Amino acid sequence: MSLQPLTAVNCGSLVQPGFSLLDLEGDVYLFGQKGWPKRSCPTGIFGVRIKKGELKLRAISFSNNSSYLPPLRCPAIAHFEAQDGKPECYLIHGGRTPNNELSSSLYMLSVDSRGCNRKVTLRCEEKELVGDVPSARYGHTLSVINSRGKTACVLFGGRSYMPPTERTTQNWNSVGDCPPQVYLIDLEFGCCTAHTLPELTDGQSFHVALARQDCVYFLGGHILSSDCRPSRLIRLHVELLLGSPVLTCTILHEGLTITSAIASPIGYHEYIIFGGYQSETQKRMECTYVGLDDVGVHMESREPPQWTSEISHSRTWFGGSLGKGTALVAIPSEGNPTPPEAYHFYQVSFQKEQDGEATAQGCSQESTDFEDSAPLEDSEELYFGREPHELEYSSDVEGDTYNEEDEEDESQTGYWIKCCLSCQVDPNIWEPYYSTELTRPAMIFCSRGEGGHWVHAQCMELPESLLLQLSQDNSKYFCLDHGGLPKQEMTPPKQMLPVKRVPMKMTHRKAPVSLKMTPAKKTFLRRLFD
């Protein structure tokens, strides 16, 4: 085992606890970014690239017929292998949005197309569920099982908000364990059935679920009602019979006391379990090998990598599996002054390094690294023994890598800034305060200072009526740090210069005809018409 520090290249602000890593068709994608997606990556999904000790993210696009997928923290993730003409995909259920709303939708994420110019397009499909639909939750697990030629999903555990009838202003954000029911989801028709087993008496969350054929094993977990982490192992056997499924549950007591752990696959139904917590204030620093076969579960302790002092002394850590026996671990940055990067990243490897990297193309007199070669035009690009999609990350192009410096500067007009020393707006736990707010907090402009600055109306303790009044008239506002007077000066009205109206001249207008007549003719004509 080895531990390698990584340097996040202009992407550290996107990572947050509760994110997910998806190993799809040989590529790894990051899902569940911090905050709502921005213009540079509206999908909120990034391709993960680790090379030469650097962590880079690349924005991924969706196909035109894709459904909207919000960024979700702590969802249930399941990998669906390609079978019966169906492509390889990931199933995503539940999770928390940046507004702390819980999702009850089921999404299917797959690769739609690959281009020769290193571009991957994903397709997201929202699956409609009917029957006993699982409620919105987070911290649960989703597993794919195969029994008697059929495929289904097993959903178990999680936390959710209190029922609407019991939810008040005081306990609005209070959560509890979901009922200990097991849900079976038919992926073809979206039918859901709930099953209550006598062996499962308490709900749990943040456990590890490992599936093999028609069995699912639940390791660890946290029971919120009793605030305990039982060291038990739950074996769930599912038979998808023609009439109704049969579920058999067995409770074993040789499990692990662990929550929020990372399961990194190292072989066929072989995993390394590490990370997470064994108590409220203690991380679990050990590594455990878990193997699944026809007999059952085999667990062995493995020597962990040599953790750094930053990891050992950090109170929290999180991460995800990169596939192929590797994982990504992040810890919060600590120090005085505060480091510019919010997190430190490490790559953990559980497999022995090979003597040399196998390359599909190379020459003894030339470099085998594709980054050392000048990029070819599309018309002259040649592939020797390689598929076009295998060159997906063969080179790093400046324009293809996500750079948070390319985003709009939100230091002055951003919604999630720290507007004052007592700022109450946290993008992770923010909820609408005013009736006019939907996805962003209401802000008001303070006219004091060099160029003025924006502050949150909630932090300034502005009543909603006064906020609406200030937004409708032309009054200046000064924040609490600059006097705290809602109305002190009136913005002078804009002086409008009078418009000078110049009469228009007609270009083709003719002067009236003047007749020269003698007085005798005038007298004759006057008598004639009289």
From Swiss-Prot:
Q: Which InterPro entries match?
A: Gal_Oxase/kelch_b-propeller, Kelch-typ_b-propeller, RAG2, RAG2_PHD, Znf_FYVE_PHD
Protein location: Nucleus
Q: Which GO terms describe its cellular component?
A: DNA recombinase complex; endodeoxyribonuclease complex; nucleus
* Residues that hold Zn(2+) 2 according to the record: 446, 453, 479, 482
Q: Where are the zinc fingers (PHD-type)?
A: 416-485
What GO molecular function terms would the record report? chromatin binding; histone H3K4me3 reader activity; phosphatidylinositol binding; phosphatidylinositol-3,4,5-trisphosphate binding; phosphatidylinositol-3,4-bisphosphate binding; phosphatidylinositol-3,5-bisphosphate binding; phosphatidylinositol-4,5-bisphosphate binding; sequence-specific DNA binding
According to its UniProt record, where is this protein mainly located? nucleus
Q: Which family does it belong to?
A: Belongs to the RAG2 family.
- Record Pfam families: RAG2, RAG2_PHD
Q: What is the UniProt domain comment for this protein?
A: The atypical PHD-type zinc finger recognizes and binds histone H3 trimethylated on 'Lys-4' (H3K4me3). The atypical PHD-type zinc finger also binds various phosphoinositides.
The protein's name in its UniProt record: V(D)J recombination-activating protein 2
Q: Which Gene3D superfamilies match?
A: Kelch-type beta propeller, Rag2 PHD finger
